[in-house]
Regions:
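Single conserved hydrophobic/aromatic residue that forms the stacking wall/gate
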Residues: 195, 199-206
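Iron-sulfur-cluster electron-transfer modules
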Residues: 1-176, 180-185, 190
């Protein structure tokens, strides 16, 4: 039950279209919320998510640390998103804290800057999307984290007149914000950076 990475490979290969992941997550949810039986390592992860807003318990203010390593300006959105900012770049936990993922974060930010795209980041206002909690069966914690982020998004886009467009590099953030949050009544136009993504002359993302 706990060895599954919820990658979806089994679902893609299943000849009768069984939704294995949904069943596995439901069983984990029962184990966590009803039986309180789960791997001890998850206890630390749950506490870190609850207290620090990331799986490792890192300082929330350190989400901005990668910006100091850039030789170009990066706008940190402190209040509502200005109309001139076209894209919100959602960095994510790994993109802010993990050294290898930070390289991707800086590369994407540089790509946006060099392409003349006006973008901004939330910095310390970000918190984990809740994907690790939901996948591990802690639906209660997921609801807390997701509502916090949805409230932040609503504040950011409170007076914004354009499309609500968000760039992400993390596939987990892409799925959670783009699909799971939509189930909670909140919808954004998601753009996932990948090798096949190109910027055309009007700065729109096409795959």
């Amino acid at each position: 039950l706990w060895s599954c990475t919820t990658c979806g490979a089994c679902v893609n290969e299943c000849p009768v279209d069984i939704e294995h992941i949904d069943h596995i997550v439901n069983m984990r949810r029962f184990q966590v919320l009803v039986e309180s039986e789960f791997p001890t390592e998850l206890g630390g992860t749950f506490r870190n998510l609850e207290k620090a807003g990331n799986p490792w318990g890192a300082n929330r203010m350190d989400r901005n640390a990668w910006i100091a390593e850039c030789d170009f300006p990066v706008t940190v959105i402190d209040g509502a998103l200005p109309d001139e900012v076209e894209y919100l770049f959602w960095v994510g936990c790994a993109g802010a804290y993990e050294e290898r993922a930070k390289k991707t974060t800086k590369a994407v930010a540089e790509l946006l800057y060099m392409s003349g795209v006006n973008f901004g980041v939330l910095g310390a206002r970000e918190t984990c999307t809740g994907d690790p909690a939901r996948r591990a069966g802690n639906e209660f914690l997921y609801q807390i984290l997701s509502r916090e982020n949805i409230e932040t998004f609503n504040e950011v886009y409170s007076n914004y007149k354009g499309k609500k467009k968000v760039v992400v590099t993390c596939p987990h953030c892409f799925t959670t914000i783009g699909r799971d949050y939509k189930q909670q009544g909140f919808e954004l136009e998601m753009v996932q950076d990948r090798k096949s993504t190109r910027l055309n002359s009007s700065h729109e993302f096409v795959s």
